[in-house]
A protein has these predicted regions:
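Residue-level detector of intrinsically disordered terminal segments
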Residues: 1-3, 447
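Formylglycine-dependent sulfatase
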Residues: 17-398, 404-425, 429-432, 437-457
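Bacterial N-terminal signal peptides that target proteins for export
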Residues: 3-16
Length: 457
């Protein structure tokens, strides 16, 4: 019965996306510089794990050298106000992959090893949408959307998977190939994870160079605890800084392969982070807050994207964009449309990436932790209201004018009650949609190793 239900769901989704794809040529990227017909663009999404806003050279780091990421910005676009949709890892990833607020999937906190919850089967992921448009799909690295069989990448549109089911600070540190544990990575072995993932990425793009592909590379660093190969360490230097530079060098090997294969002009490459810094060593560039908080330092992260001939080189935009915008952006870029059977919170941000066409947002950006709306940002991006929740606790709402005070140092709620009232009303509207469920924090009682690996059959 389960197989029949899954087959029916897949058939319905394929039909929905096929019809949408047929109609898309008339309307995708309306008013913008739509890529010409021809080969669908390859999509490479590269994620750092808890990288602070200023810890990339092109964002002003005085101590960290990142020529690979800087090169993406030089040859493409850099967003100065790109936001993640949640303050912690698991729901942040849900938002990107579904184009929806994480609470719609019932995930509003970090998933733990052997949690009974994970990414629901009825969510349509970016991988599924692109797969149904003819893409090969591969996930590499940190997943963190559930480690039980039904929640793994190969059940959510990815043809293959090599990576870790959760963060490096959660035991045991397991490496999974598709649906089975293939290794446990203590100490020195964990130091080689980044290189191993990039090796796999290079093999993947080489093997799939003649068809459109979606490569999802989710690095496990610079999330602590950090272990690096001896050759990547600098005596006396913070390991966090070495880790970011190591990630940059390893990612450079993938971009070199894409260039060598002649795929650069057919590939959009995005690099960003899932959250702000967890480590005190992370530099948010004067922005307040860290992971777990909806202050700017916890949710504003680096974002650079390259697509030669489509995204102008050297472009910089300060228009607010949020992670769930990337689902419709990339689906439209691939020639499809988002399904019409559910609420999508994101919108096509292609005009922001290219500087061509109109982009306006009608609704505020909203952050939700558990069943609390923690912050609201008005569509233009000036006013940000904090309501508490998550790691932040305070008695009264706080209002900040980000145009004048991006560091959120001066609460102006008492001077602008009209703005507080308007954004509070917006928060209440969202709160009506927030289900009274959220991720359960289960202890590690039956880790994957104890089951001899994970099977999807």
């Amino acid at each position: 019965m389960m197989g029949m239900q899954q087959a029916y769901r897949n058939h319905a989704r394929v039909l929905l996306l096929f019809v949408a794809g047929v109609l898309a040529s008339a309307g995708a990227h309306a008013g913008s510089d739509e890529p010409p017909p021809g080969r669908k663009p390859n999509v490479v999404w590269i994620w750092a794990d808890n990288l602070a806003y200023r810890d990339v050279g092109c964002y002003g780091s005085p101590t960290i050298r990142t020529p690979t990421f800087d090169g993406l910005a030089r040859d493409g676009v850099r967003l100065t106000r790109y936001y993640v949709a949640h303050v912690v890892c698991s729901p942040s990833r849900v938002a990107l992959l579904t184009g929806r607020q994480p609470f719609r999937a019932g995930i509003t906190d970090v998933l733990r090893p052997d949690s009974p919850t994970g990414l629901p089967a009825d969510e349509i992921t970016l991988a599924e949408a692109l797969h149904d448009l003819g893409y090969a799909t591969m996930a590499l690295g940190k997943w963190h959307l559930g480690d039980r069989p039904a929640f793994l990448p190969t059940r959510h549109g990815f043809d293959g998977y090599l990576g870790l089911p959760y963060s490096m600070d959660m035991a045991p540190t397991l490496l999974i190939r598709d649906d089975r544990v293939i290794a446990e990575l203590p100490g020195p072995a964990a130091a080689e994870v980044t290189e191993r993932l990039v090796d796999e990425a290079v093999r993947y793009v080489t093997a799939n160079r003649d068809r459109p592909f979606f490569l999802y590379l989710a690095h496990t660093i610079p999330h602590p605890p950090l272990t690096l190969p001896d050759a990547a360490r600098t005596p006396g230097r913070p390991i966090y800084e070495d880790a970011v530079e190591y990630m940059d060098r390893q990612t450079g090997r993938l971009l070199e392969a894409i260039d060598r294969l002649g795929l650069a002009d057919d590939t959009i490459v995005v690099f960003t982070s899932d959250n702000g810094p967890m480590s005190k060593e992370g530099d948010a560039g004067g922005l307040r807050g860290r992971i777990g908080e909806s202050y700017e330092g916890g949710v504003r992260v680096p974002f650079v994207a390259r697509y030669p001939g489509k995204i102008p080189a050297g472009r910089v935009s300060d228009v607010p964009v949020i992670a769930y915008d990337m689902f419709p952006t990339l689906v439209h870029l691939a020639g499809g449309r988002v399904p019409g059977d559910r609420i999508y919170d994101g919108q096509d941000a292609w005009p922001v990436l290219t500087g061509r066409g109109e982009f306006s947002r009608a609704k505020p950006l909203v952050w939700v932790f558990d069943d609390n709306v923690t912050a609201v940002l008005d569509p233009p991006g000036r006013w940000k209201l904090h309501l508490g929740g998550g790691a932040a606790t305070f008695a009264q709402p706080q209002l900040y004018d980000l145009d004048a005070d991006p560091a959120e140092a001066h609460d102006v709620a008492a001077r602008r009650p009209d703005v507080v009232k308007r954004l509070t009303a917006a928060a209440e509207e969202v709160r009506k949609d927030v289900p009274k469920v959220w991720t359960l924090k289960y202890p590690v009682r039956d880790p994957l190793k104890a089951r001899g690996g994970v099977r999807t059959k």
